[in-house]
Amino acid sequence: MAQVVADPIVDKSAILKSELSKQPETLIAYAKWYGKVAGPITGVDLSAIDAKSLTLICTLSDGSKQQVRIELSPPLARYEDAKPRLLEMKTRALEGLGLTKTPVITNFIFPSLALKTTIWSVAGLLYLTFVPNPYLTGANIPRAWAAVGLIHGPQAIYTATLARKHVGNLTTGVSYVLGTLVFGFPFWIDLRQRITAARVESVAKIQ
């Protein structure tokens, strides 16, 4: 018989509901952006929250009520993930509604994660490419580079979409895209983390 995993949020949902009830602008932003509630909203109550969704009760200008269920994707794995996720959702909603500026990254920083991971495999491949090795056939190296391109290519495209929206100059954007093309995931992960940090900072300034 399959074991039922307990929801990590339900037992502490009262804490989250209490904190969010003090942020009416956040709940309205959720309702407008994620819930697609049309028309003026005079108030929003958070009626429920769990690992998979939050439920809002919106009071419209004519006095009527509208219930909105907003899915959390992916679901929250633990309670400690709730506040960062809700804050990120708030920043995205405020950006989408035009109430705050989209975060812009203006400088390039070589990701420390790359120094611990993919840089060594790429360096090894470069060495084998230019230094003859009697144990490798001529076809193996091109195949290895083709595999790198096949794996890193889609990641570079994803990085380009992030850079197009969130990077403020061509040099920085190209650096992240080329870095991803050569070294892979450490570059797009670093860029996404910097964007998230910039979002949090922008919200902190308007709270």
From Swiss-Prot:
It is a multi-pass membrane protein. Its main location: membrane. Pathway: Mycotoxin biosynthesis. InterPro entries: DUF2470, Haem_oxidase_HugZ-like_sf. The chain crosses the membrane at residues 108-128, 169-189. One of its GO terms (cellular component) is membrane. The structure of strobilurin A was used for the development of the major class of beta-methoxyacrylate agricultural fungicides since its beta-methoxyacrylate toxophore targets the Qo site of complex III of the mitochondrial electron transport chain and prevents adenosine triphosphate synthesis. Compounds such as azoxystrobin (Syngenta) and Kresoxim methyl (BASF) are among the most widely used fungicides worldwide. This class of antifungals are used as effective treatments against a broad range of destructive fungal plant pathogens and make significant contributions to food security. Keywords: Membrane, Transmembrane, Transmembrane helix. It is found in: Membrane. The keyword Transmembrane applies. Part of the gene cluster that mediates the biosynthesis of strobilurin A, an antifungal polyketide that contains a key beta-methoxyacrylate toxophore that targets the complex III of the mitochondrial electron transport chain. Strobilurin biosynthesis begins with construction of benzoyl CoA by step-wise elimination of ammonia from phenylalanine by the phenylalanine ammonia-lyase str11, oxygenation by str8 and retro-Claisen reaction to form benzoic acid, which is activated to its CoA thiolester benzoyl CoA by the dedicated CoA ligase str10. This is Strobilurin A biosynthesis cluster protein r1. The lineage of its organism: Eukaryota, Fungi, Dikarya, Basidiomycota, Agaricomycotina.
